Amino acid sequence: MDHSRRDFLKKSAVFTLATAGGSLLPEYAAAQLKPKLSELANYDALGLVELIRKKQISPLELVDDVIGRVERVNPRINAVLTKLFDVEKARERAKNGVLEGPFAGVPVMLKNLTQYKDARIDAGSRLYARYIEKKGNPFRTNSPLIDAMERSGMIVAGIANAPELGLLDTTEPVLYGATRNPWNTDHTAGGSSGGSAAAVAAGIVPLAHGTDAGGSIRIPACHCGLFGLKPTRERELGNTHAWSLGMESLNIASELCLSRSVRDAAAFLNVVEKKNIENLPPVGFISGPSKKRLKVALTWETFLGKKPHPEVEKAVRESAQLLESLGHKVDETKMGFDGPEFMDTFLGIFAAFTMQYEARIELLIGGEIKREDALEPWTLGLIEMAKSRGGIQPCSQRAIKVFTEASAAVEKLFKTYDAILSPVMRVPPYKIGWHSPTLDFNTLLTRLLDELGYTPLHNAVGTPAMSAPLYWTSDGLPVGSH
């Protein structure tokens, strides 16, 4: 591997336009687009803003191009839920809206797990879809974060697929079907922001909204060859809504985006960042890398003590070598807390908050529901797990204790190191169906615990974390470094 800065920038997709004759898109996606569409699909969001400012293209033309990309590319990957959004609303805003701000005129996708008044957001759940059919859209306003996105000039051009209630690391909801990885459509795009990731990776949009309560931005970014950042706890504007898991009390959920370039994510964070946060000085807009040389702690083992797949190990080891070639110091170490207890506690708190869904929607609908027809087996299994553990109160109390211990271990590590490097997932992108929500609960649980072993830590302790696209497997599948 050439560890030059040029190679690093190329692999990080910082170059916003492919070199002559080349493409940043998977081959099949580029082949589906007309020449002009394929060329535009190679720009990042800020690159498109520059074209708009130079009047080389209009926002309406961009929206129409996105509609064309959805028509040509989406049937293969099922990233965009065309039934949930009226594209004429996007065309109207592009045509008549006063578009100002750092993302003026850029079409984006919203994850099907947010508060948005102009589309049917059902969280990939048959239960919520039935509620909407009976009661209508519960949202009369956007969340503060979505409002900030629109004030920045972004044009919502569609809704991206997500697993039921955002509860899995793959996007295969029974309600809408599986989202497929643009690099190999037999494989998962990840979850829970899998539709957003696939839409960006396939060149449908340059940027898409995502949420992350256990890895849901970073895992799809890892699997789809994108940049994905989970911000520091409380850093971004809130998005509490009726479909929320209720995890705000533990502050483990964050929101941001999936992007093809680091600079797009930096600009997005600047747009949605809270400007007056106690103990958190503003980040502002980061225009380039720091000159500071870092001490990096490299950790290999999952929470259950397992080593990564050989391709994943190679990906992270090459990232470590790249960091060293750029002047940083990398040491192998261990995290220093009880990994199995942490993972079991994290799973328990997910289960406890999921249990609240059923009662909440029964109350909203005004009657009991037939559970097996309304919720997926994985969701039902989590509800039963929570009941067996006593519900929300004991699970929350345990989480506070265990997460505090994990925070102390991370804080101790940061007294010596500036950053932590690890895999995102223990394995490369697996095939569709391997983590299907319709599998037997214990089978899926075993697979999940075996392969998800790094990302939840940073949700629990509140540290920022990202997946950077620096490696492709011998089979042509992306593997990010964390």
Language model regions located:
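Short helix-loop capping/hinge segments that flank enzyme active sites or metal/cofactor-binding pockets
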Residues: 103-132, 290-300, 349-411, 423-427, ...
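Short, well-ordered beta-strand elements
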Residues: 253, 257, 477-482
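Residue-level signal for inorganic ion chemistry
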Residues: 66, 265, 296, 323, ...
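Short, surface-exposed loop/helix-turn segments at secondary-structure junctions
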Residues: 430-452
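Gly/Ser-rich catalytic/binding loops embedded in alpha/beta enzyme cores
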Residues: 17, 21, 33-213, 321, ...
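Acyltransferase
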Residues: 59-64, 308-336, 358-369, 396-417
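N-terminal secretory signal peptides and thylakoid transit peptides that target proteins
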Residues: 1-16
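A short helix-breaking turn/cap at a secondary-structure junction
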Residues: 29-32, 38, 230-319
